[in-house]
Amino acid sequence: MSRRVFASAVLLLIVVTMCCGGAATAQVGSNADASTPGSALTGAIAGEGSSSGGVEGLQRVDLFVPQKTQVLPKKGPDSSRRDSFFSPSLVSAGGVIAAFAEGHINTKNPHNESAKPFSDVVAGYIDSAWEWPTLVEKVSESTWQAHTVLGKAEGKKSLDVVLRPTTTTKGNKVFLLAGSTDLSYVNWSWREGSLELKLVVGDVTKPTSSEPTERIKWGEIKSLLNESTIAAQKGKLTEFLASGGSGVVMEDGTIVFSLMAVNEKKDGVFSLIIYSKDNGSTWSLSEGISPAKCGAPRITEWEGSLLMIVDCENDQRVYVSRDMGTTWTEAIGTLSGVGSTHNWETIGRRLAVEALITVTIEGRKVMLYTQRGYALGETETTSPLYLWVTDNNRSFFVGPVGMDNAVKGELAGALLYSDGGLHLLQRRDSGEDSVMSLSRLTEELKEIKSVLSTWSQKDVFFSSLSIPTVGLVAVLSDAAGDGRWYDEYLCLNATVTNATKVKDGFQLTEPDSRAVWSVNIPDGNVRHISLSHNFTLVASVIIEEAPSGNTPLLTAVLVDAGPEYFMRLSYTADNKWMTMLKDEKKPTTESRPWEAGKEHQVALMLQGNKASVYVDGELLGEEEVPLTGEKPLEIFAFCFGACKIDGDEEESSPKEIGKKPRVTVTNVFLYNRPLNSTEMRAIKDRIPVPTRAPEPQVKIAPKPAAPAAPAGNEETARETGDGGANGDAVSAYGRVLLPLLFLLGLWGLATA
């Protein structure tokens, strides 16, 4: 039986809107049990779909199993079972991990008034101190039970069907928001009433036994919206539904949930937020909303701003708000495979971001997110769910944590990092039913910590040499092997062909010697870098001797909506530099010479629609680039050495005339922003930051200790030590969300 039980014309809009999202979503409906009344609420909004099974090696246990797990009501000893579980949500507070899901009982006879279908919100409680074997043992016992938190069993009106539990915590309080409606039997079918938002708050109490089942005491159910609250929104919205997943507690303590809504015109689904600045006593709707036909929002906080990811008709987008949803700014520019350039009608919902949370690991604030991709060696009907970590400069591909069967639908999951553990609550199929399983991502967390440690070490090292680290995405230096030039930040390696390893780089000694660094080219199993219309690539090169003719040194290949565009720096036999910055491929020879055996610094820069080439920190040439500025660069690659492009003239190779190229390329730095001349000079000079001599010890009368900084504000203290090279960059870029959005595989923010 389908999870959805409604057929109103109002919410049918939501189904139509979200079913347009892709083939995977549409398949959910085709696999639903036809015995259930059609649902407009989340028949396609949620679209959680199914999993073909887990990924080998994961620690996983089933928490909620259809027709097996006993569910206790709030009052009374009589338990019951559910037919299926949907919409996972996961939180932790006061030493208790609480896993939530919709629990559905399906009617076998939709034309029988006595067989009324319903759904409620159920929860399972786990002691966060349990080791994994203990957790598995407890959950596997016959006494393991789930608990009803919000549903008709409590005798409340408009709770026949409760959908999309959305949770967050503040202190020892758990906030649960859900959508609800009642059912009435009219003309031999079930009809739903109007949608309502219900909130219930639980207090985590001190343990009275070894079991966590009584640790959360739930309060009274509260309706969140009234006429004045809705009228204040000014968007003429009429019905609201919780988004599911996770809410957010902002740095200032504001509690935020994401919602979906329809307006009086019934012209599509809108996404927005509801928030409380007084610990849940009163609530306000955001004035701003997403465009029509953009639903299933996920939200997270980053440096005081809200990020909201929405699923639209043909793509996935991200919006940012710095004023609690009064205004939402769409980020411009996306990664390949996400957005309008690769819509869901052609690739389904692959490469879409799913769960998204902001956490602090090892003292570093990062975002964790899951994203579907392509499984190498798998059929087109399967795609793994990947886990990623980003720190607003760079992202790291951790690995697959689930496998999606694209024929049946899509995975739904919720991430939680708490008490030193990383968990994933995930819905997966079990025949006709859906199971909620919990995974503890122990090995994945170890890898994340190792990567974050590497990032910190590299930042400190480069800063000690006065090299700017703000916006530094990747570095190619001394690490190499197996035909690869390893990125020091572990994000993306370059591929090297017929080159000799030297200190900090490679020497290109053959006619076909080259090093290729591909970015913005999606590959499900490759760690990638994501750039938009702002970047700088800086490298050190030594030309050992003059070539026989014009020889490419550094090429960037860009593809926007139109034909390919090339940025190229070459060197000539008469010791001149040559630039090519036009798609007509007409090179310009510069009078400035290169010197054999001397280390030169070369740089390619793209700033909006302006492409520039620099040598030794001085501008060699620049041109306007025919880029739209509205779409991401679909193909983007850097190449050192023999990188032939269409239109290159056939010339006698150095081998044919007895002369081979000899160019050494070392220390390549890639930034997701433009650099100024001072910063490029700092990279070239690499002046160590002087260490301060020990201060003389002077005895001073003790003073009262200053109050400790408020918890959660540790990110306001930022690393320095780059000899001033980062000064301007920090103010200009330090808090810009652009790099973060690109790394996520979403619409990038063009201007802060």
Swiss-Prot record:
A Pfam family: TS_C
Keywords recorded for this protein, A-Z: Glycosidase, Hydrolase, Repeat, Signal
Swiss-Prot/TrEMBL GO biological process terms: ganglioside catabolic process; oligosaccharide catabolic process
EC number: 3.2.1.18
Gene3D superfamilies according to UniProt: 2.120.10.10, 2.60.120.200
Region feature Disordered, mapped onto this chain: 693-725
Role description: Developmentally regulated neuraminidase implicated in parasite invasion of cells. May contribute to the pathology during T.cruzi infection by cleaving sialic acid from cells of the immune system.
Protein name, as recorded: Sialidase 85-1.1
